[in-house]
Amino acid sequence: QFFNRMNIVLFDEPKIKTSLLPFTFTRPVAEIRVGIFTIADKWRRIANSQVSFLTDEYLSKKFASKNSGDNYIINGALLPDEKIFQAIAKLEKGEALVKEGLLLAVRADFLPFYEEIDSFFTEYSIEEY
């Protein structure tokens, strides 16, 4: 498993978060259930790792982010499968994975503030998925 020692942080993409209201008033996007598991549960299972969240400040006390020197920051609305898991695992620090203009994941050595999420990734090397 690629992520055993990696830090996985599931972020709320602002437009997706807004489109999923009222569910996302009380939880991050990745804590919404899809079937019997939440999206975060699915990431925990495929990565065999714990996850944390990058979300609005008022939710961050209950759903905190864990920062390390090597972070996989993944769109919380992204449902994991083996193909996307492999693509994210191949990212080098400073690389981002994007599909049709939507940020899927980035590998970074620090976490942005949630309010800066839209502008944080503009300096990264982009790979189209």
Question: Predicted segments — roles?
Answer:
Residues 2:
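Cationic, low-complexity basic patches in intrinsically disordered or flexible, solvent-exposed regions
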Residues 5-129:
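Terminal amphipathic alpha-helical/low-complexity segments used for targeting or macromolecular assembly
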